[in-house]
Amino acid sequence: KPTKLTRTIPTVSFDSGMVFERDASLFGKSTTQTLEPRLFYVYTPYENQDDVPLFDTGRSGFNYAQLFSENRYVGLDRVSDANQLTAALVSRFIQEDGAERLRLAIGQRLYFEEPRVRIAGEAAQQSRYDLLLAAGGTISESWTFDSGVQYDAAGSSLYSSNVSVQWRPGKMKAVNAEYRYQRDSFRNIDLSAQYPISRRWYGVGRVSYALRSYGVGQAVNPSTGSKLIESLIGLEYQADCWVFRMGAQRFVTAAQTTSTPIFFQLELNGLSRLGLGNPLESFNKSVPGYTRLNAGIGRP
């Protein structure tokens, strides 16, 4: 059996747009409103990837970033084939300090070919045309939100949706909640956080729970259709000149199969990192808004 798998999958994309601006007011505050027509085309040829193990890759929840994404999956185990064109109109409200207060987008995606790469439990793309809606912005100084809807125009039904909120009350503090839905595939809730426990100790965690799951890759509880599909727990200790991280992560790799890697790391500020696994990568991927404790000191 081969001990190393390699893939070479080319991707060609074309992104074009224009930006128009005008003075506006939002909730009584002066802002600059933009109007941004945009065209995004991506082509990735199909390649059978069934010989590549599926570890931590899943279908991304639909939001603004997915409007102009080349790969519909999160993770490196699958590269989606694509031959599609997205036409969108984006409007932003930008405050005087440069912060984006509100973002609205509407678009339509044309599939020239039906995507053939799919993971277990993922429903096939049934429509050549999808209506895309997205909204995001700042609710207050510490609260932000992001949301998106993908509507199947041909079938007159909702294909996927996503809504997330984030609370960032201060430095090294982030709490996230997200709901993701895809028709005939999944309905998940994700909760994640980075938060100080004491002056030097910080906790990191994530829980991803399937409220309803379909297909071989997720359905393991036929009585309720629900299950825990991913969890992460981690601790960090910050000293004057070093940081120690440790954690464990559990996720579903296939039907009835789970993986639980354990990792730890000692980082000497500005010098090097020693340990088992890569907790920094896991924390960054699992917790939106995660901040490295010694950020700004220097990266080894």
Q: PLM ranges: what are they?
A:
Residues 1-300:
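Outer-membrane beta-barrel translocator/pore domains, especially the C-terminal barrels
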